[in-house]
Swiss-Prot record:
Stored InterPro entries: UPF0637 (IPR009403), UPF0637_domain_sf (IPR053707)
Gene3D superfamilies (UniProt xref): Protein of unknown function DUF1054
UniProt protein name: UPF0637 protein MCCL_0722
Pfam families linked to this entry: DUF1054 (PF06335)
Organism for this UniProt entry: Macrococcus caseolyticus (strain JCSC5402) (Macrococcoides caseolyticum)
Similarity annotation: Belongs to the UPF0637 family.
Amino acid sequence: MTKYHFTSKDFNVFNVEGLEPRMVALIETTRPKLEALGEYFSSYLSQHTDETFYPHVAKHLRRKTNPPNDTWVAFSTNKRGYKMLPHFQIGLFDDHAFVLFGIIYESPEKERMAAKWQQQVNDILALDRDFIIKSDHMKKTYETVHSLDEDALKRYIDRLINVKKGELLFGKVFFPDDAALMSDKKFLAAVEDTFFKLLPLYI
Protein backbone atom coordinates (compact mmCIF):
# COMPACT_ATOMS: atom_id res chain seq x y z
CA MET A 1 0.00 0.00 0.00
CA THR A 2 1.23 3.48 -0.90
CA LYS A 3 1.47 5.46 2.31
CA TYR A 4 3.69 8.44 1.50
CA HIS A 5 4.45 9.00 -2.20
CA PHE A 6 2.08 10.62 -4.65
CA THR A 7 0.82 8.65 -7.66
CA SER A 8 -1.25 9.43 -10.74
CA LYS A 9 -4.39 9.03 -8.61
CA ASP A 10 -3.31 11.98 -6.47
CA PHE A 11 -2.49 14.21 -9.44
CA ASN A 12 -5.77 13.23 -11.12
CA VAL A 13 -7.75 14.47 -8.11
CA PHE A 14 -7.39 17.95 -9.58
CA ASN A 15 -9.14 16.86 -12.78
CA VAL A 16 -12.35 16.10 -10.88
CA GLU A 17 -14.93 18.77 -11.68
CA GLY A 18 -16.81 20.62 -8.95
CA LEU A 19 -15.97 21.57 -5.39
CA GLU A 20 -17.72 18.75 -3.55
CA PRO A 21 -16.66 15.88 -5.86
CA ARG A 22 -13.05 17.09 -5.85
CA MET A 23 -13.01 17.42 -2.07
CA VAL A 24 -14.37 13.87 -1.72
CA ALA A 25 -11.62 12.58 -4.03
CA LEU A 26 -8.97 14.60 -2.22
CA ILE A 27 -10.07 13.45 1.23
CA GLU A 28 -10.23 9.79 0.17
CA THR A 29 -7.10 9.66 -1.98
CA THR A 30 -4.52 12.26 -0.98
CA ARG A 31 -5.27 13.49 2.52
CA PRO A 32 -4.24 10.21 4.23
CA LYS A 33 -0.80 10.59 2.63
CA LEU A 34 -0.53 14.20 3.76
CA GLU A 35 -1.43 13.15 7.29
CA ALA A 36 1.19 10.38 7.20
CA LEU A 37 3.80 12.78 5.81
CA GLY A 38 2.80 15.27 8.49
CA GLU A 39 3.49 12.80 11.26
CA TYR A 40 6.76 11.61 9.73
CA PHE A 41 8.28 15.01 8.95
CA SER A 42 7.10 16.87 12.04
CA SER A 43 9.22 14.33 13.90
CA TYR A 44 12.10 14.70 11.41
CA LEU A 45 12.14 18.51 11.66
CA SER A 46 11.85 18.44 15.44
CA GLN A 47 14.85 16.12 15.66
CA HIS A 48 16.96 18.32 13.39
CA THR A 49 16.14 21.70 14.95
CA ASP A 50 15.67 21.09 18.69
CA GLU A 51 12.27 22.75 18.27
CA THR A 52 8.85 21.12 18.24
CA PHE A 53 7.22 21.14 14.81
CA TYR A 54 3.53 20.53 14.22
CA PRO A 55 1.86 19.40 10.98
CA HIS A 56 -1.00 21.38 9.44
CA VAL A 57 -2.90 19.54 6.70
CA ALA A 58 -4.85 21.82 4.36
CA LYS A 59 -8.60 21.48 4.91
CA HIS A 60 -9.79 23.99 2.27
CA LEU A 61 -12.70 24.93 4.54
CA ARG A 62 -13.05 28.48 3.22
CA ARG A 63 -13.86 27.31 -0.28
CA LYS A 64 -17.52 27.72 -1.19
CA THR A 65 -17.50 27.52 -4.99
CA ASN A 66 -14.14 26.91 -6.64
CA PRO A 67 -12.39 23.58 -6.00
CA PRO A 68 -8.77 23.68 -4.75
CA ASN A 69 -6.00 23.63 -7.37
CA ASP A 70 -3.44 22.25 -4.93
CA THR A 71 -3.20 20.72 -1.48
CA TRP A 72 -0.46 20.35 1.11
CA VAL A 73 0.76 19.70 4.61
CA ALA A 74 2.73 22.52 6.26
CA PHE A 75 5.06 22.35 9.25
CA SER A 76 5.60 25.10 11.81
CA THR A 77 6.51 25.53 15.46
CA ASN A 78 3.02 26.80 16.30
CA LYS A 79 0.39 24.18 17.08
CA ARG A 80 -2.44 26.44 15.93
CA GLY A 81 -1.18 27.53 12.53
CA TYR A 82 1.70 28.09 10.15
CA LYS A 83 0.98 31.10 7.92
CA MET A 84 2.43 33.63 10.35
CA LEU A 85 5.76 31.78 10.61
CA PRO A 86 8.55 30.54 8.38
CA HIS A 87 7.43 27.02 7.50
CA PHE A 88 8.05 23.89 5.48
CA GLN A 89 5.55 22.40 3.01
CA ILE A 90 4.91 19.18 1.10
CA GLY A 91 2.12 19.21 -1.46
CA LEU A 92 1.03 18.97 -5.05
CA PHE A 93 -0.71 20.61 -7.99
CA ASP A 94 -2.13 18.61 -10.90
CA ASP A 95 1.24 18.37 -12.66
CA HIS A 96 3.91 18.39 -9.95
CA ALA A 97 4.59 17.81 -6.28
CA PHE A 98 6.49 20.38 -4.25
CA VAL A 99 8.73 20.38 -1.18
CA LEU A 100 9.34 23.91 0.07
CA PHE A 101 10.59 26.11 2.86
CA GLY A 102 9.86 29.80 3.09
CA ILE A 103 7.59 32.55 4.26
CA ILE A 104 4.32 33.87 2.88
CA TYR A 105 2.67 37.27 2.86
CA GLU A 106 0.72 36.88 6.12
CA SER A 107 3.87 36.61 8.22
CA PRO A 108 5.15 39.47 10.40
CA GLU A 109 8.60 37.85 10.27
CA LYS A 110 9.33 38.73 6.65
CA GLU A 111 11.90 41.41 7.53
CA ARG A 112 13.77 39.11 9.92
CA MET A 113 13.95 36.30 7.37
CA ALA A 114 14.91 38.67 4.56
CA ALA A 115 17.80 40.00 6.65
CA LYS A 116 18.94 36.44 7.33
CA TRP A 117 18.73 35.41 3.68
CA GLN A 118 20.59 38.54 2.57
CA GLN A 119 23.50 37.20 4.60
CA GLN A 120 23.12 33.77 2.97
CA VAL A 121 23.04 34.74 -0.70
CA ASN A 122 26.11 32.67 -1.55
CA ASP A 123 24.73 29.66 0.32
CA ILE A 124 21.43 29.91 -1.53
CA LEU A 125 23.15 30.22 -4.91
CA ALA A 126 25.21 27.14 -4.03
CA LEU A 127 22.13 24.92 -3.61
CA ASP A 128 21.91 21.95 -5.98
CA ARG A 129 20.95 22.69 -9.59
CA ASP A 130 17.44 21.31 -9.16
CA PHE A 131 16.44 23.66 -6.33
CA ILE A 132 13.81 26.24 -7.18
CA ILE A 133 12.64 29.63 -5.94
CA LYS A 134 9.13 31.07 -6.09
CA SER A 135 7.45 34.26 -4.97
CA ASP A 136 3.81 33.11 -4.83
CA HIS A 137 2.88 29.88 -3.09
CA MET A 138 -0.53 29.84 -4.79
CA LYS A 139 0.91 29.70 -8.31
CA LYS A 140 2.75 26.92 -10.10
CA THR A 141 5.41 29.24 -11.51
CA TYR A 142 8.99 29.11 -10.28
CA GLU A 143 12.60 29.60 -11.37
CA THR A 144 15.61 27.42 -10.72
CA VAL A 145 18.04 28.90 -8.21
CA HIS A 146 20.82 27.90 -10.61
CA SER A 147 19.45 30.33 -13.23
CA LEU A 148 19.84 33.34 -10.91
CA ASP A 149 22.81 35.58 -10.34
CA GLU A 150 23.44 37.44 -7.09
CA ASP A 151 21.52 40.54 -8.17
CA ALA A 152 18.47 38.54 -9.26
CA LEU A 153 18.35 36.68 -5.95
CA LYS A 154 18.66 39.94 -4.02
CA ARG A 155 15.71 41.32 -5.99
CA TYR A 156 13.62 38.37 -4.82
CA ILE A 157 14.63 39.06 -1.23
CA ASP A 158 13.99 42.81 -1.56
CA ARG A 159 10.54 42.10 -2.99
CA LEU A 160 9.72 40.06 0.11
CA ILE A 161 10.12 43.20 2.22
CA ASN A 162 8.93 45.91 -0.15
CA VAL A 163 5.78 44.30 -1.58
CA LYS A 164 2.85 43.82 0.79
CA LYS A 165 1.96 40.48 -0.81
CA GLY A 166 5.63 39.53 -1.08
CA GLU A 167 6.56 35.91 -0.45
CA LEU A 168 9.67 33.80 -0.89
CA LEU A 169 10.00 30.03 -0.92
CA PHE A 170 12.81 27.65 -1.81
CA GLY A 171 12.70 23.94 -2.53
CA LYS A 172 12.20 21.29 -5.19
CA VAL A 173 9.47 20.10 -7.52
CA PHE A 174 8.82 16.51 -8.56
CA PHE A 175 6.91 15.61 -11.72
CA PRO A 176 4.70 12.50 -11.89
CA ASP A 177 7.35 10.43 -13.69
CA ASP A 178 10.17 11.47 -11.33
CA ALA A 179 12.12 8.60 -9.81
CA ALA A 180 11.45 10.05 -6.35
CA LEU A 181 7.75 9.30 -6.81
CA MET A 182 8.24 5.64 -7.64
CA SER A 183 8.15 4.41 -4.03
CA ASP A 184 7.60 5.52 -0.45
CA LYS A 185 11.26 4.88 0.35
CA LYS A 186 12.50 7.05 -2.51
CA PHE A 187 10.09 9.88 -1.78
CA LEU A 188 10.88 9.99 1.93
CA ALA A 189 14.59 10.06 1.10
CA ALA A 190 14.08 12.88 -1.42
CA VAL A 191 12.06 14.98 1.02
CA GLU A 192 14.55 14.36 3.82
CA ASP A 193 17.41 15.45 1.56
CA THR A 194 15.52 18.57 0.46
CA PHE A 195 14.58 19.63 3.98
CA PHE A 196 18.09 18.91 5.26
CA LYS A 197 19.60 21.22 2.62
CA LEU A 198 17.02 23.91 3.37
CA LEU A 199 17.48 23.80 7.15
CA PRO A 200 20.38 26.33 7.16
CA LEU A 201 17.94 28.88 5.71
CA TYR A 202 15.72 28.34 8.74
CA ILE A 203 18.08 27.81 11.67
